[in-house]
């Protein structure tokens, strides 16, 4: 009572909007490499490389990484034994810039030069693959090191294998540099709608002092 509720501001096209995807990597019952998402309330991986809210390019990138692992005998991480190398694949996409970052999360503190070179070669080739019909291309290939027995996906340290250590994207007219460890809103279209509505409701005149607490990288106050 005493409140007015407005309808939710939805998306016109609620598909292919998500600019970040994290895929666990494991071993299927038949011994093959599996990439996808965890089944509900489990750590059993359901094979799925094309989620309809994610970028279409992700599936081709995952296919290349899986093939690279198979050809080079690179084992997926096993949570039970703590063995195996590849834990997750993180893919970030610049919604406004079409830049792609691929980050391999590994159970180790280093990877051999031969493996690095072959991975970079395969991934830089896929950025020009005819299967990718957009203007998007890989601008950053990274390693992230996570040797902890934890559910946390990323470790604290990263290494740049090729390209930049970040990709760039915009919210409004502000350009941001986004690393594997950056917190950045995952739905660019709705982010701008949300921030715009918040600014409208705030009704700021320029004479106020506003504290932007717990602001992350400051996207709201900079908008």
Where in this protein do the model-derived segments appear?
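Accessory RNA-recognition modules of RNA-modification enzymes
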Residues: 1-223
């Amino acid at each position: 009572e005493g409140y007015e509720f407005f309808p939710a501001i939805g998306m016109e096209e609620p598909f292919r909007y998500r600019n970040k995807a994290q895929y666990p990597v494991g071993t299927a019952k038949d011994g093959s490499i599996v990439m996808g998402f965890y089944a509900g309330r489990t750590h059993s991986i359901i094979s799925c490389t094309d989620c309809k809210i994610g970028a279409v390019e992700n599936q081709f990138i995952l296919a290349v990484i899986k093939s690279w692992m198979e050809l080079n005998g690179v084992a997926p991480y096993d949570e039970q034994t703590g063995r195996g190398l590849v834990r997750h694949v993180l893919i970030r996409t610049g919604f406004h810039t079409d830049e792609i970052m691929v980050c391999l999360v590994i159970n180790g503190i280093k990877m051999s030069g031969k493996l690095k070179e072959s991975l970079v070669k395969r991934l830089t080739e896929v950025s020009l693959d005819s299967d990718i019909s957009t203007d998007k291309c890989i601008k950053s290939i990274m390693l992230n090191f996570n040797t902890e027995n934890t559910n946390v996906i990323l470790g604290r340290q990263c290494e740049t294998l090729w390209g930049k250590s970040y990709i760039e994207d915009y919210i409004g007219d502000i350009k941001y540099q986004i690393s594997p460890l950056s917190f950045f809103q995952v739905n660019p279209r709705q982010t701008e709608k949300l921030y715009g509505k918040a600014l409208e409701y705030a009704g700021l005149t320029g004479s106020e002092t506003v504290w932007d607490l717990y602001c992350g990288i400051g996207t709201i106050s900079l908008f």
